[in-house]
Regions:
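Carbohydrate-active catalytic/glycan-binding domains of CAZyme proteins
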Residues: 1-3, 7-108
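Extracellular and organelle-lumenal recognition/adhesion modules and their flexible linkers in secreted
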Residues: 95-370, 388-390, 405-419, 489, ...
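Solvent-exposed strand-to-loop "edge" motifs in beta-rich extracellular domains
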Residues: 231-236, 274-276, 630, 672-674, ...
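An active-site-proximal structural segment forming one wall of the substrate-binding cleft
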Residues: 275, 281-282, 305, 309-326, ...
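The substrate-binding groove and active-site-proximal loops of carbohydrate-active enzymes
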Residues: 301-309, 357-372, 409-422, 460-475, ...
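Catalytic-core region of carbohydrate-active enzymes that cleave or remodel glycosidic bonds
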Residues: 483-486, 490-493, 511-514, 520-631, ...
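Carbohydrate-binding surface patches
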Residues: 651-691
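C-terminal beta-strand-rich structural cap/linker in extracellular carbohydrate-active enzymes
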Residues: 713-741
Length: 741
């Protein structure tokens, strides 16, 4: 619907009210503006009859539109016209790309540059600047980082996971092969109320097999061991032996075992299967006797997980993440955390405890969350790789884009009812107790200890909200949560939110709330073009250093047509990260998004790392993140760049960042060149202290559309040294102080 603008009669004083429909029959939203450019936060005050009676039709630019026609003062029209002109100019800058460099830099010769360090201006910067953001999108968890090989192991898939898809049900990924046996789903007497569905096999004559296809198959590696487990019972009390096989597409048995189900009650049965071949297989469970069998939580897990953890993570994927050296991990997601509607808000308590007692739910990205990868596993992974955990919880409201658009209160659906907010806030406080509480003295500390981790996880950060519409509904609930955390856990660093963009109403109102409450940190998000990042390297230079609130750039990425990841996008991000290091006194954390994507199951591009069942495929941008993560510092050494070319188009495409790691004493020089020609650079490190003459150099370079790997070698350095910065390149030079090994 075209929004109608109801303009007050006192044009220079009154706000203009923009009103729009939430559905076809009643309910509406409103926002106000003095100039039709800057708007207040949205409100959903009451229901109203249909707008058709107050609208008129008009032909605008050759097309019929519906709305109101109002007489306004010229200053308002003039302001709109000037704003349009400014946006057109800004969009032209944001549209700059290397594809235009042939024309833009026709005849450009190699540039000479001097990079001079200014150690007297050194400043401390965040020691947790570069991290990772894990969201369960693109099959990142089940079928991805979570090492479980059986899909729909709990028979809890439901059509509601995928917008009513009838084929997405409790039998998805399962099939019965053979005759004289039936396969049905029951809920009469489950293992746990949170896991109500289970399989029932009625065997009239042995020979049939219950099969599971896994996630695009089950990939085995020769000689590796796999833990098979199953909850089962024989209601009639007659024992039944199960043959368990892993079979490839040609019918070859690549691994097998057997076990006997003998209990009338639910019981766990376990066995180990050793792979006879490297193959893509499926699971077969073949009962050897007649009678009824009940089966649930059918699991196949590689023993060779990351750090050898039970119920752990896929080793190669987890290692690629660990190699970034992320100083923190944000989880379990952004949109996943605040959910698609009130009923879909992520509840952390449903993800801890025994696997059979965890409560699965719909993933708003169109599939299922088993919760096998739950809060315990997230915290454990953070600990395993030395990263700070940063859990994100809903701020009492779901995503404003929730599918229930017909709700009269908008996508936020009025938020969690006030009668329930006390319990919801207690859940958040319980999370902090679960993470940090004494294993013997606190209720939730004991729960953590019972899961195998008696020592506290030492949680320091907690995110409240994600990209939320900053409405009165949000503000009221966020404030309640924030004040409760501040009162009970004053040392906790709460990370708030300022909407989904780096400008606009939610950004402005979100920052107002941060200033009002004194929120320690806010989470900014923006996915932008190469030209935006190129022309906004000073975005945080202008930040008010007197503010108490720090910035977490929680989601960002460079987007180009086709959403590809290549040298163009990677170098753009390298250039911007140099600016973020420069502003590391106010930008406390950063994380690229999204992190993982399974080939054939993506809902978003680009992603940092793609994978399938056998391969991990880091993008070019991954290596930029890795180079910054492995070469981080906690002291920023300002530098001055002097060029022999005064063209601003040249200047803004060359960047340098010099940091020192106090733990090692190493000085790290990062140089970025987004020009199509070499930059002959003299690096002057006078004043930083004695250094070794040999340094490690890593270079990532190629044509804009290329996807190369970085090349590492050594180079000679001195207090002053020359270096030819290749066209379209990112170079990291790590220099040790003298007398260090």
């Amino acid at each position: 619907e075209i929004a109608q603008c109801l303009v007050g009669s006192e044009m220079c004083i009154r706000d203009r009210i923009c009103t729009w429909k939430l559905n076809d029959h009643d309910g509406y939203g409103q926002a106000t503006s003095k100039d039709l450019i800057n708007w207040t936060s949205q409100k959903y005050p009451r229901t109203t009859p249909d707008f058709d009676g107050v609208r008129v039709k008009a032909i605008v630019a050759g097309e019929e539109q519906k709305g109101n026609i109002n007489r306004v003062v010229w200053t308002l029209v003039d302001g709109l016209d000037k704003n349009y002109g400014w946006n057109q100019y800004r969009n032209s800058l944001h549209g700059e790309r290397p594809i235009q460099d042939g024309e833009r830099f026709a005849g450009l010769k190699p540039v000479k540059a001097t990079v001079t360090v200014q150690p007297e201006g050194a400043k401390a910067i965040s020691d947790v600047l570069l991290g990772a953001f894990f969201e369960d999108i693109n099959y990142s968890a089940d079928g991805g980082l979570y090492a479980e090989l059986i899909q729909n192991r709990d028979f809890e898939y439901a059509p509601s996971d995928r917008e009513g898809d009838k084929n997405w049900n409790s039998t998805h990924s399962w099939a019965l092969k053979g005759e004289k046996t039936t396969f049905t789903i029951d809920t009469t007497d489950p293992i746990h109320i949170n896991n109500p569905h289970y399989a029932v096999l009625n065997v009239e004559q042995p020979g049939a097999a219950l099969e599971n296809t896994g996630f695009d198959g089950i990939a085995l590696n020769t000689g590796e061991k796999y833990d098979f487990s199953i909850f089962a019972r024989v209601p009639q009390g007659k024992s039944n032996k199960l043959q368990v096989r892993l079979v490839d597409g040609k019918g070859n048995v690549c691994g097998e075992t057997s076990l006997t189900v003998s209990s009338r009650q639910w019981k766990t049965y376990k066995a180990v299967i050793t792979a006879k071949a490297t193959a893509d297989t499926h699971l077969e469970i073949i009962p050897q006797s007649v009678g009824e069998l009940n089966l649930d939580m059918i699991s196949l897990f590689p023993q060779n997980t990351f750090k050898g953890r039970k119920n752990g993570l896929r080793k190669d994927l987890a290692q690629v993440l660990a190699d970034i050296h992320p100083r923190f991990i944000r989880f379990p997601g952004g949109c996943v955390a605040h959910g698609d509607g009130l009923k879909n808000i992520y509840q952390w308590k449903n993800t801890v405890g025994p696997l059979e007692a965890r409560k699965a739910q719909r993933n708003l990205w169109g599939y299922h969350q088993s919760m096998g990868l739950g809060y315990f596993e997230y915290f454990q992974f953070c600990e395993d790789i030395g990263a700070e955990p940063l859990p994100v919880l809903a701020a009492g409201v779901p995503c404003q884009n929730s599918a229930c658009h017909g709700d009269l209160r908008g996508g936020q659906q009025g938020g969690i009812p006030m009668s329930e907010m006390g319990a919801y806030i207690q859940d958040i406080l319980d999370l902090i107790e679960w993470a940090n509480g004494d294993a013997k003295k606190t209720k939730w500390g004991k729960v953590r200890a019972e899961a195998g981790h008696p020592k506290p996880f030492n949680l320091k950060y907690i995110g409240i909200g994600n990209e939320d519409l900053i409405t009165d509904i949000f503000e009221e609930r966020f404030t309640m949560i924030f004040n409760a955390i501040k009162e009970k856990y004053p040392e906790m660093i709460v990370v708030g939110t300022v909407g989904p963009f780096n400008e606009g109403t939610d950004y402005v109102e979100g920052w107002k709330l941060a200033d009002k409450l004194g929120i320690p940190m806010v989470d900014e998000h923006y996915y932008q073009t190469p030209g935006w990042f190129l022309n906004n390297q000073d975005f945080y230079d202008k930040y008010d250093r007197s503010k108490k609130t720090k910035v977490y750039l929680g989601e960002y990425a460079t987007h180009i047509p086709g959403r590809k990841a290549n040298i163009e996008t990677a170098l753009t991000e390298a250039l911007y990260l140099a600016a973020l290091e420069r502003n590391g006194d106010v930008v406390h954390m950063t994380s690229y998004a999204p992190l993982l994507a399974k080939e054939g199951h993506t809902q978003w591009n680009p992603d940092l790392i793609y994978f399938n069942n056998r391969e991990v495929k880091p993008t070019t941008g991954y290596y930029v993140q890795k180079l910054y993560g492995q070469n981080a510092g906690n002291e920023y050494l300002p530098s001055k760049i002097t060029l022999d070319n005064r063209d601003d188009q040249v200047r803004k495409r060359i960047a340098a960042s010099i940091v020192r790691d106090s733990a090692s004493g190493d000085v790290i020089v990062k140089l970025v060149n987004l020009l199509p020609v070499e930059v002959n650079t003299n690096v002057d490190l006078s004043g930083i202290g004695a250094i070794q003459s040999s340094a490690k150099r890593t270079v990532l370079t190629g044509k804009p559309a290329d996807t190369p790997l970085p090349v590492e070698d050594t180079m000679e350095v001195a207090e002053k040294f020359d270096y030819q910065l290749p066209a379209y390149s990112f170079t990291v030079i790590r220099i040790k102080k003298a007398n260090e090994k």
